[in-house]
């Protein structure tokens, strides 16, 4: 079974599943899950293939979640090894998706095969929620599957998302929550004119700069035991016609909050509007809530995971909520306990993405031990 983890990861990498394509990855997994007693349900929404596979109907219901889609490779000539080769060299498995997250998918599947073979009458239920829309707009993937499950009253109790959570060594970090993400799109109106006649124009860049300074210097909260303080970052500023002698008529600013559980997205929106109004700006502002913050505190899932990592690696893991968002946010909103555990993330989305074969083998052992801790 040890070599099987690597072989399966290679086979998945060799399928060019650039988001939202699945390229047959889910079928490969489904065939093996069905062989060990899982009921398979394929859910296709618009351009996205999703799989819901479940074995058992009882609680506790433990779910492995992940994605088969990968980000584009960029120019393949920049890669040391072809990005869809799945080549193993010097103890590293190379290819797009090796770390994010086809390696995790292989480890989940093989761990589950081992577990159900040893424990055909295990407690509770095991499921897999797999999508090909995590790296894309996340419209027709996990969120649609969750909607389907909720509509028929199917509840996940605990979920492990295989995102690459580890930092320096396998298992050193488990994400037991994530910050919320809120994006604002601001348009400030001015009056276009000639730069030599500023008295006849209103420069929206000049008008907006003090407000942006205040927003960037505002302390939104102080975080808490589990979350760092909420952060505000400006990501894009666009103004001007391209000509050097024209005062622009409007300014567009895009910004993002990564927010803790100490503040709500509504409170952030209200505070931003109050600041903009204090500066007497003529503006339009729209918002996208990309995800709400979630937190899984110590309990069966976290404790089983910490214990498994210690057993396999000898490490005492760190529980963190830093980093970006993941599909875990859609699952957590149902009340499920959610964590993220996967390989090291140093090469994700980069040229020459790779993962240690030893790490994948150990990750499979950790996943299997988590199942042992929870369902036997």
UniProtKB/Swiss-Prot annotation:
PROSITE patterns linked to this entry: ARGE_DAPE_CPG2_2 (PS00759)
GO biological process terms, semicolon-separated: diaminopimelate biosynthetic process; L-arginine biosynthetic process; lysine biosynthetic process via diaminopimelate
GO molecular function (one): succinyl-diaminopimelate desuccinylase activity
EC class (word): hydrolase
The reaction(s) this protein catalyses: N-succinyl-(2S,6S)-2,6-diaminopimelate + H2O = (2S,6S)-2,6-diaminopimelate + succinate
Coiled coil: none
Binding positions for Zn(2+) 1 per the UniProt entry: 67, 100, 163
Co-factor note (free text): Binds 2 Zn(2+) or Co(2+) ions per subunit.
InterPro entries according to UniProt: ArgE/DapE_CS, Bact_exopeptidase_dim_dom, DapE_proteobac, Peptidase_M20, Peptidase_M20_dimer, Peptidase_M20A
The UniProt record lists the keyword Zinc: yes
Keyword Transferase on entry: no
Recorded superkingdom: Bacteria
Cofactor requirement: Zn(2+); Co(2+)
Pfam family, one: Peptidase_M20
EC number: 3.5.1.18
Location of the active site: 69, 134
Pathway(s) where this gene product acts: Amino-acid biosynthesis; L-lysine biosynthesis via DAP pathway; LL-2,6-diaminopimelate from (S)-tetrahydrodipicolinate (succinylase route): step 3/3
Keywords assigned by UniProt, alphabetized: Amino-acid biosynthesis, Cobalt, Diaminopimelate biosynthesis, Hydrolase, Lysine biosynthesis, Metal-binding, Zinc
Positions that bind Zn(2+) 2: 100, 135, 349
Function: Catalyzes the hydrolysis of N-succinyl-L,L-diaminopimelic acid (SDAP), forming succinate and LL-2,6-diaminopimelate (DAP), an intermediate involved in the bacterial biosynthesis of lysine and meso-diaminopimelic acid, an essential component of bacterial cell walls.
Similarity section: Belongs to the peptidase M20A family. DapE subfamily.
Subunit structure: Homodimer.
Name of the protein in its database record: Succinyl-diaminopimelate desuccinylase
Provenance organism: Pseudoalteromonas translucida (strain TAC 125)
Lineage: Bacteria, Pseudomonadati, Pseudomonadota, Gammaproteobacteria, Alteromonadales
Gene: dapE
